[in-house]
């Protein structure tokens, strides 16, 4: 009687690292205005104003997700200074995961009254994996 035992060693699974994404919104001269990062769950954007400065009197900067199709989705008014967090709705998460594109417009104080950009689009950027 002959018995054989075969041992198979499998490598330990490598834990999947969370994907990190970020963007830099720059002025024409290359100075960063805001730094953006996406949490590993994709449901929160963290923004830090670097050299943005305040919008002109009676105006605010507004952040938008630019989907691959359809109209932009507002993520709210951007602070001219400080760090700010923006919670993303399911719709915004879905749009951002597809297009990875954000835009900033100049809007009336308090943001767009229509839910769509009404002022000039000042900056467009993409989120990139870090």
Residue ranges and their predicted role:
Residues 1-130:
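N-terminal targeting/export leaders
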């Amino acid at each position: 009687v002959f018995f054989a035992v075969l041992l198979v060693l499998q490598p330990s699974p490598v834990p999947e690292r969370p994907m990190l994404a970020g963007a830099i919104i720059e002025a024409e001269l290359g100075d960063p205005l805001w730094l953006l990062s996406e949490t590993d769950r994709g449901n929160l954007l963290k923004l830090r104003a670097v050299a943005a400065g305040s919008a002109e009197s009676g105006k605010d900067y507004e952040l938008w997700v630019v989907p691959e199709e359809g109209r932009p989705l507002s993520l709210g008014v951007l602070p001219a200074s400080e760090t700010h967090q923006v919670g993303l709705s399911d719709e915004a998460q879905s749009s951002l995961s597809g297009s990875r594109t954000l835009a900033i417009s100049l809007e009336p104080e308090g943001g767009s009254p229509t839910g769509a950009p009404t002022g000039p689009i000042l900056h467009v950027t993409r989120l990139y994996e870090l």
